[in-house]
Design a protein with these regions (language model features):
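Membrane-proximal helical linkers
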Residues: 164-171, 222-254
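Short helix-perturbing small/polar motifs within transmembrane alpha-helices
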Residues: 1-56, 60-217
Length: 254
């Protein structure tokens, strides 16, 4: 019951975010909207299981971040939420309630991150403004907001489903090196996408796809190596513990 209420509230919040942002800016044009819709849709299809097995890491986070930097909030929210919903229903074949939850989560996350970026003085209209040192704090504010809102909403649904506290789920699922490194890389990749788009226009899509592929592959290798090292250390620890416990049994009374 509580899980259903939570999902309903998140979906309603997503609808409220769309309403608050207003209709997409008509000055943006149909071609840029279509480009970023396809970019986000492609990112949604490139996903990785989360290292702890809870949820997944979506390469769409990079496209989401680039979109909210370059497009007005109204356009960014529509494009990113629509791309995620299409990916869930058409390609991933998720249940409608999960697709609706992801829609609401994406709309809320992107709207708040875009709000943080704009309200802190962020500019993404030209390459000079995007590369300006004055954009450092707005970009950081947007990235932190995106990460906290996104992971917080996911933690809420996992906590209700498994009967745990939100804080415990967030700490176990997101507050560790793999997730933080992955999120940081995706935000930086999104920033790079925005720079490439303002520099080379639609031709930047080819470089972005290549960069995404190699970064995704590198992250897979990084996580696999780190998990293998952790498993090896755990085995060695257990072996040492067993030897300590077994040592008294080897003594003989003379």
């Amino acid at each position: 019951m509580l899980l259903t209420v939570y999902i309903t509230l998140v979906v309603a919040a997503g609808g409220l975010a769309l309403w608050a942002c207003g209709a997409p800016d008509p000055t943006v044009g149909a071609l840029p909207l279509l480009f970023w819709l396809l970019a986000n849709l492609l990112g949604e299809l490139l996903w990785l299981p989360a290292p702890k097995g809870r949820g997944y890491l979506s390469m769409a986070n990079a496209a989401n971040f680039a979109t909210l930097i370059l497009l007005p909030a109204s356009s960014a929210v529509v494009v990113t939420a629509l791309a995620g919903t299409l990916a869930d229903l058409v390609f991933r074949r998720r249940r409608w309630d999960r697709a609706l939850f992801n829609f609401g989560m994406c709309a809320v996350t992107v709207s708040l991150a875009s709000l943080a970026f704009r309200n802190s003085g962020g500019l993404g209209t030209t390459i000079d403004s995007l590369l300006s040192p004055l954009n450092a704090m707005p970009l950081l504010a947007a990235a932190v907001t995106y990460f906290l809102v996104n992971t917080g909403l996911v933690s809420g649904v996992i906590a209700l489903h498994q009967g745990q506290s939100v804080r415990e789920v967030w700490r176990e699922s997101f507050a560790f090196s793999y997730e933080i490194v992955g999120a940081t890389v995706l935000m930086l990749l999104g920033y790079l996408f925005a720079i490439l788009f303002l520099t080379w226009g639609y031709m930047s899509a080819f470089i972005a796809v290549i960069a995404t592929y190699f970064i995704r592959d590198a992250y897979v290798r990084y996580v696999a190596g780190a998990q293998a090292a952790a498993a090896s250390a755990e085995v060695e620890k257990n072996r040492n513990a067993e030897s300590v416990v077994a040592a008294p049994a080897n003594r003989r009374v003379r």
